[in-house]
Amino acid sequence: MAARLCCQLDPARDVLCLRPVGAESCGRPLSWSLGALPPSSPPAVPADDGSHLSLRGLPACAFSSAGPCALRFTSARRMETTVNAPWNLPTTLHKRTLGLSPRSTTWIEEYIKDCVFKDWEESGEELRLKVFVLGGCRHKLVCSPAPCNFFTSA
């Protein structure tokens, strides 16, 4: 069974909320402002590793009070990239992760809104989830003892 996330837009508060699907009731929703730009480097991961949620295959930053790095990246209102075609988005985000020079575009914002700014639930191999992972998160996954795959870990 794949780790599953439910991402919900709260238009009243202009906040994107990420909730683990099937987590214990003690699991808290993660939310952050959509208007804030992402930091240039990943934030420190808090001591709380999220183990109380009994979920593996999630980046350690998924349990940060600021929310996951990759989703915070894709939820920024203003996106910058090095390409001019939507089908190159995953490659573009990976290049941005490596620190290559970006330039402003207009299509990228609409593309991300179409993928993210709706209620959705993800599990397994899915393009939108891959886009989030390629968005720049450098944190280790929460899993043990063997290496895990973000898309297939239970």
Swiss-Prot record:
GO cellular component, one term: host cell nucleus
Keyword presence, Membrane: no
Chain segments carrying region Mitochondrial targeting sequence: 68-117
One matching Pfam family: X
Post-translational modification: A fraction may be phosphorylated in insect cells and HepG2 cells, a human hepatoblastoma cell line. Phosphorylated in vitro by host protein kinase C or mitogen-activated protein kinase. N-acetylated in insect cells.
Keyword Transcription assigned: yes
Domain of life of the source: Viruses
Example GO biological process: DNA-templated transcription
Keywords, sorted A to Z: Activation of host NF-kappa-B by virus, Activator, Apoptosis, Host cytoplasm, Host G2/M cell cycle arrest by virus, Host mitochondrion, Host nucleus, Host-virus interaction, Modulation of host cell cycle by virus, Transcription, Transcription regulation
First-listed, main subcellular location of the protein, grouped into a coarse class: host cell
Subcellular location: Host cytoplasm; Host nucleus; Host mitochondrion
Family from the record: Belongs to the orthohepadnavirus protein X family.
Subunit organization: May form homodimer. May interact with host CEBPA, CFLAR, CREB1, DDB1, E4F1, HBXIP, HSPD1/HSP60, NFKBIA, POLR2E and SMAD4. Interacts with host SMC5-SMC6 complex and induces its degradation. Interacts with host TRPC4AP; leading to prevent ubiquitination of TRPC4AP. Interacts with host PLSCR1; this interaction promotes ubiquitination and degradation of HBx and impairs HBx-mediated cell proliferation.
Function: Multifunctional protein that plays a role in silencing host antiviral defenses and promoting viral transcription. Does not seem to be essential for HBV infection. May be directly involved in development of cirrhosis and liver cancer (hepatocellular carcinoma). Most of cytosolic activities involve modulation of cytosolic calcium. The effect on apoptosis is controversial depending on the cell types in which the studies have been conducted. May induce apoptosis by localizing in mitochondria and causing loss of mitochondrial membrane potential.
Protein's name according to its UniProt entry: Protein X
Organism (species): Hepatitis B virus genotype H (isolate United States/LAS2523/2002)
Phylogenetic lineage: Viruses, Riboviria, Pararnavirae, Artverviricota, Revtraviricetes
Gene transcribed to yield this protein: X
